Structure formats: C-alpha cells, structure tokens
Amino acid sequence: MAGYRVEDDYDYLFKVVLIGDSGVGKSNLLSRFTKNEFNLESKSTIGVEFATRTLKVDGKVVKAQIWDTAGQERYRAITSAYYRGAVGALLVYDVTRRATFENVDRWLKELKNHTDPNIVVMLVGNKSDLRHLLAVPTEDGKSYAEQESLCFMETSALEATNVEDAFAEVLTQIYRITSKKQVEAGEDGNASVPKGEKIEVKNDVSALKKLGCCSN
C-alpha cells in the first residue's frame, strides 16, 4: 500500500466511520493516519469531523473519507447522517478501560442498524502502549472479533503502532469486495468511479470471509 498523495485524483472513494466510546482515541487514530500527528491534549470531538487520505490498493487509487464523532450520548441525533454511505468502520475500544470493551456490542448493533449488513468492520483495541494498565487481554478482543466475523488489531495512536495497517486492511477489503463484484457483473476492470460517488458494498455476505481478514 503506497503512502501519501497530494493529487486529488482517485479511482474509488470509500467512506469509513470511527465508532466507540468517548476517550478511546478515535480522533488521534484519525490524525495519526491522515496527518501522522498525535495530540496528547486532544479534547473530545464535538459534532462530526472528517479527514481524507489517498492510497494505492492493488494498483488503484483509493481515497478514504474517514469520519469521526464524539461517543457521548448527547450526539446520538446525528447517527443516521453519520453512518449514511459508510462501507467500512473501525470499532474502537481502550485496552485500559474494560467498560469501553463491554460497550463494543452496543456500538456494533447500532452500526448494523444504520448500514449495509456487509460493511467491513475492524475491531480496534487502542492504547496498546499502556501495557502496564491493561484491562482487556488481547485474547478477549480476538475472541469477540472471531465471534462476530470482524477483523481485529491492537493499535497505539501515540506510538503509531498498527494504525496504518488497521486502516489499510479495511480499505483493501472494501476494494477487493468491490472489484470482485465489478468482475462478476461483467464490468470493465479498469472502470473508475466518478468523484463524489460512494461505492456501496451490498449483498455479498461470504465475500469478506472468503478473502480472509487480519487477526493479529
């Protein structure tokens, strides 16, 4: 997967959402991936923010539009608009706060209620640098991810550990499902998506499982 590109020239535009409790590090994951920055004093997001980054996947240029919102209940009203058009999600918990992991199930249900059932989801245990404060063993995250057929990674936005890999894996899975469906539909493999359009990943329950997903 290639690095940063300045040009606003792409073949695919994928919307990816960050979900999970407030304070788990969603905004820092976003800024680390899109700007390679980390802010120790970042405050809770108010409303919705999004940032973009363009990468190459299998020779195609993919633009990721990544949305971040606060986890507090008072922002629930924006739910529908936030999820609309999303084809990927990072479901984030804090490995040092057990309650954030216990709330993952509620977040996943909400995600499924507002998106296509075949959305690509990565379960992310963030703040892996704080090993001395660990409250959620890696095996707990892996087990839940396997149970729900999700990808899984532990990350550290502070140390930039696995952040690139987590986003890249989600975008790669979305792209491969999308391109597979294009081939099956008899479309030209070089067909590009007009700017401003989202690729919808629909009706392909088995595709992600066939392709395989990360579990490290």
From Swiss-Prot:
It is found in: Cell membrane. It comes from the Eukaryota. It is a lipid-anchor. GO terms for molecular function: GTP binding; GTPase activity. GO terms for cellular component: nucleus; plant-type vacuole; plasma membrane; vacuole. PROSITE patterns: RAB. PANTHER family: DRAB11-RELATED (PTHR47979). This is Ras-related protein RABA1b. The lineage of its organism: Eukaryota, Viridiplantae, Streptophyta, Embryophyta, Tracheophyta.
